[in-house]
Amino acid sequence: MFGPQIRRVKLEKQSELRIELQPTSPLRLRLLDGKAEIFGYELPHEVWITFPPLMTFAVFTWYGATIEIDGITGNEYISCETPMVNYLGLHNSLQVQRHRVTSSTRDSASSQEGPRVIIVGDIDSGKSTLAKMLLNWAVKDGWKPTFVDLNVGQSSITIPGTIAAAPIKMLVDPVEGFPLDKALIHYFGLTNPSVNLRLYRTLVEELARELKEEFSANAESRASGMVIDTMGFIVREGYALLLHAIRTFNASLVIVVGQEEKLVYDLKKNLKFKKNLQVLNLEKSEGVFSRSSDFRKTLRNSNIQNYFYGVTNDLTVYTKTVKFSDVQVYRIGDFRVSGSTSAHQRGNDPLKITLVTIDEHLVNKVLAISYAIKPDQIISSIVAGFVCIKNVDISEERITYVSPSAAELPSKILILGTLTWHVT
């Protein structure tokens, strides 16, 4: 797989090598000389980094670099046309705001906050990439910003169908991604917010409340601020959700990525009475790869597999069993769990908590492990992780499930959504 395709690529200053990997072929890459970065993560010298299939990324250099590549790519080319200077200028302005908070007097600093940046734009505009850059550059300068991920379709922190936040204390590795150990994760259970708009808004509000409590007790997090990534759902219901998120998280800066003149105009119009809020339009990188709906589905399946096996297949998946009587499975909202009409089902009570009958229909379903003690706490509680049901034995009343952890289930309450995964 590796070896015959080894080649060197020389990058001139302020240029980048854009790479799209094939569905089945990994790639190795290392920096030989100069300095280069991926999503703001500075590459170490002479260290091979293995990128799994399906990844798309760009190796950028400010002053020139030579890299070595081992493997076959689906698409690669060098470009000197990048928006990186503008992106770095944005980072520098955020730094000024952070320093302004820390240099304030103690009394005023307690009521001031660092930048709360929310990134919006159409699908495939580079929102997540910009978020990673801003986070990594902030960490490199000694800050510990919080990343908030509201994109249930292509979640970055953990599996799809989640609304989550994580404190970023170390550089975000371009392969391993975001840390999970301190993440606050709510399970929406769907990849399309339109199916249950009220539940989506409610979970966004719950996450904002939790972060408000965290920031009130942590001056470092408060000064470092947050970077919020959103969906590429920017019209009609999607636009209403953007406005809701901007107000709920009390954003101080809305970044619109791409040539979205109407979106910029509408946001400025609808938010003109909100104090201390700026709307900024940044150009989209021409290196952003367009992804089909089928490819997005493949990515979602890959993200679920990565949760259980690890991005580099370095995790052990444990098969365990539990009695029916030791767990309770619930779903949120009145939507049909199986069948082609599930995405269009509207319930009269979108926040209704329903006990699910344990039977064969749970096989291959991904369930969230809730920290809730009682069913009425499910929506307000974060989740500990996820399991996938491998088998349901009705006669023995036992469930067989797989988990990336060998530990027993930390809670008896499990949440069912629409996500499925076939255990390999």
Curated annotation (Swiss-Prot):
Keyword Repressor: no
GO cellular component: mRNA cleavage factor complex
Keywords: ATP-binding, mRNA processing, Nucleotide-binding, Nucleus
SUPFAM superfamilies, per database record: P-loop containing nucleoside triphosphate hydrolases
Any Pfam family hit: CLP1_P
UniProt GO MF annotations: ATP binding; polynucleotide 5'-hydroxyl-kinase activity
Residues reported to bind ATP: 16, 56, 124-129
Record keyword Translocase present: no
InterPro entries: Clp1, Clp1/Grc3, Clp1_C, Clp1_C_sf, Clp1_N, Clp1_N_sf, CLP1_P, P-loop_NTPase
Subcellular location: Nucleus
GO biological process, one term: mRNA 3'-end processing
Protein role: Required for endonucleolytic cleavage during polyadenylation-dependent pre-mRNA 3'-end formation.
Quaternary structure and partners: Forms a complex with cleavage and polyadenylation specificity factor (CPSF) subunits PCFS1, FIPS3 and CPSF30.
Homology family: Belongs to the Clp1 family. Clp1 subfamily.
Cited PANTHER family: CLEAVAGE/POLYADENYLATION FACTOR IA SUBUNIT CLP1P, PROTEIN CLP1 HOMOLOG 5
Protein name per the record: Protein CLP1 homolog 5
Gene source species: Arabidopsis thaliana
